[in-house]
Amino acid sequence: MGVPKRKTSKGRRDKRRAHLALSGPALAKCPQCNEMRLPHRVCPACGYYRDRAVLEFEEE
């Protein structure tokens, strides 16, 4: 089994992790109400998914 000959330096370790940064969530505009929502999910503002009302909201 391969064993490291030298301790990996902090610089080399951090260079390797340069591309591991997290990005924000991908958002899409709801065609019904123009609110931002997660793609492939029901819009939490209006309850529509693929031009159909999936959730019912109570009127106050």
From Swiss-Prot:
One of its GO terms (biological process) is translation. Disulfide bonds: none annotated. Residues 1-20 are annotated as: Disordered. GO terms for molecular function: structural constituent of ribosome. Residues 1-19 have a biased composition (Basic residues). Keywords: Ribonucleoprotein, Ribosomal protein. Belongs to the bacterial ribosomal protein bL32 family. This is Large ribosomal subunit protein bL32. It comes from Syntrophobacter fumaroxidans (strain DSM 10017 / MPOB).
